[in-house]
Every structure is written in C-alpha cells, then in structure tokens.
Amino acid sequence: MIESQRHSYHLVDPSPWPISGSLGALATTVGGVMYMHSFQGGARLLSLGLIFILYTMFVWWRDVLRESTLEGHHTKVVQLGLRYGFILFIVSEVMFFFAFFWAFFHSSLAPAVEIGGIWPPKGIEVLDPWEIPFLNTLILLSSGAAVTWAHHAILAGKEKRAVYALVATVLLALVFTGFQGMEYYQAPFTISDSIYGSTFFLATGFHGFHVIIGTLFLIICGIRQYLGHLTKEHHVGFEAAAWYWHFVDVVWLFLFVSIYWWGGI
C-alpha cells in the first residue's frame, strides 16, 4: 500500500551513488598521490577513480532528472531549496576567487625584493590586454547576453528560440576557451616564472576550468530544452546554469581589469 505524502518535501529513496562517489574520490586521491610519487599502479588507480566519479555523476544526475521531470518530486518548496543551495554554492566559489585575488594584490601592491621590488616582476614580459584578453571579454559578455536571451525565450514559451540561444551561448563559450588556450600557448612566461606567473595561471586557469564546467552545464540544458524538459513554470536547472554563467562573466571582468590591465601596467 502506497502511503499518501502530506508535505511538499522530497524524501529521496535509498541510493548507492553517494558511497560510490566517495569510493571514486578516495581512489582518485590515493591514485593521484601515488602517481605524483611514481609508485607503481598510481596512474591506473587515478584513472579508475576518475572513471568511477564520472560514472557516478552521470547516473546520479540522471536519477535527479527522472525525479524532477518524470516523477514530479520537485515541488515549489523543493525548487526554492535548490535555488538557495545553488546560491550558497556560488558564494563558496566567490570565496575561492577572493583568495586568488588576495594573493595577486598582496604580491603586486607590495612587491618583494626577490622580484626586484617592482610589478610586474623584473624580466617578465606581460600580455597585451587589448589583444586576445579584450576579445575574450567581448565574447564572454556576448555569451552572457545569449543565455539571457534563452531565459526570456523559455519564459515566453518559445522552445526553438531558446534552443538557438543556448547553441549560440555554447559556441561563444567554445570560442572563448579556444582563444584562452591559444593565449596560454603563446604566453612569454610560465606558471613557474615568479609570483606573477603563479597568480596569473592559477586565477585565469581556475576561471577557465569554470568556463568548461559551465559550458557542459549549458549543453545539458540545451539537450533538455530540445527534449521538452524545460517549461516556463519549471526550469530550475537552467536558472542554475544561467546564474553560474553570469558569475563566470563577472569574475572574468575582475580578472581583465585587475590582472591583465592594471597588473600589466
């Protein structure tokens, strides 16, 4: 006999994915340490752990999509909780980048004697901010406008237009990533070239990683939009992707102004 549910909350069924994800993370961590210290079997254990994590992510998110789209477990109350949770996740990401900017300004506002007492450090040839960095700024801002276009299309019930807008967003994101990779390849300094190289590649590389994650997030949203999963009443997944993408936009603006422009003067 099925008991009636007298509340708006989603009580999830028992799932094997939390423990499988934990085992994958353990294997990845141990394998990574073994690989870095050249222990036999480290690379295999690291690869196995990563595969396990990716598989767990796929099947876990698949179950969440089933629960929300097909089974109707994501009520208004559940959706509100998901929104609050994702906002807190973005706040935690802000703290990550705050630490990177702190390291950059700590090093640049009071340059140590080891780097010549100047910023950029002596011997460092910086990148021109008005070449690829400025072009990437325009591309990323355009992608932010495109994802907003997709949001308005979803709210208006225009499914095809939303798909087109998401495709445009993803294409712009891929172009941005390509230019970023080109910039890294052509950079006249490396991550080991003083504190400048360390903070530059750490901050911009971490941002680039977020761009890749956000691109995958938007691709999934585009597929779901094409399949008719997203409606104007229920599109929390897309909202989370859009918020994440706007966060990536804002971080890039800070990176461009502080590290590329001001930090290269």
Curated annotation (Swiss-Prot):
**Top enzyme category:** translocase
Major localization listed first in the record, in broad terms: mitochondrion
Which subcellular locations apply to this protein? Mitochondrion inner membrane
* Alphabetical GO biological process terms: mitochondrial electron transport, cytochrome c to oxygen
Reaction catalyzed = 4 Fe(II)-[cytochrome c] + O2 + 8 H(+)(in) = 4 Fe(III)-[cytochrome c] + 2 H2O + 4 H(+)(out)
Q: Which residues cross the membrane?
A: 41-61, 85-105, 137-157, 162-182, 200-220, 245-265
Query: What UniProt keywords are attached to this protein's entry?
Result: Membrane, Mitochondrion, Mitochondrion inner membrane, Translocase, Transmembrane, Transmembrane helix
Is Zinc-finger tagged as a keyword?
no
Recall the GO molecular function terms of this protein's record: cytochrome-c oxidase activity
Q: Which InterPro entries match?
A: Cyt_c/ubiquinol_Oxase_su3, Cyt_c_oxase_su3_dom, Cyt_c_oxidase-like_su3, Cyt_c_oxidase_su3-like_sf, Cyt_c_oxidase_su3_a-hlx
Disulfide bond annotation, renumbered to this chain: none
Domain of life (superkingdom):
Eukaryota
Q: How does it sit in the membrane?
A: Multi-pass membrane protein
Is Chloroplast set as a keyword in this record? no
Record-listed E.C. numbers: 7.1.1.9
Q: Name one GO cellular component term.
A: mitochondrion
Q: Which SUPFAM superfamilies match?
A: Cytochrome c oxidase subunit III-like
The UniProt subunit note reads as follows: Component of the cytochrome c oxidase (complex IV, CIV), a multisubunit enzyme composed of a catalytic core of 3 subunits and several supernumerary subunits. The complex exists as a monomer or a dimer and forms supercomplexes (SCs) in the inner mitochondrial membrane with ubiquinol-cytochrome c oxidoreductase (cytochrome b-c1 complex, complex III, CIII).
For this chain, the family text in UniProt reads: Belongs to the cytochrome c oxidase subunit 3 family.
Protein task: Component of the cytochrome c oxidase, the last enzyme in the mitochondrial electron transport chain which drives oxidative phosphorylation. The respiratory chain contains 3 multisubunit complexes succinate dehydrogenase (complex II, CII), ubiquinol-cytochrome c oxidoreductase (cytochrome b-c1 complex, complex III, CIII) and cytochrome c oxidase (complex IV, CIV), that cooperate to transfer electrons derived from NADH and succinate to molecular oxygen, creating an electrochemical gradient over the inner membrane that drives transmembrane transport and the ATP synthase.
What additional remark is attached to this entry?
A stretch of 270 kb of the mitochondrial genome is duplicated within the centromere of chromosome 2 resulting in the duplication of the gene. The expression of this duplicated gene (At2g07687) is not demonstrated. It is also probably not RNA edited and therefore differs in all the positions known to be edited.
Specify the protein name: Cytochrome c oxidase subunit 3
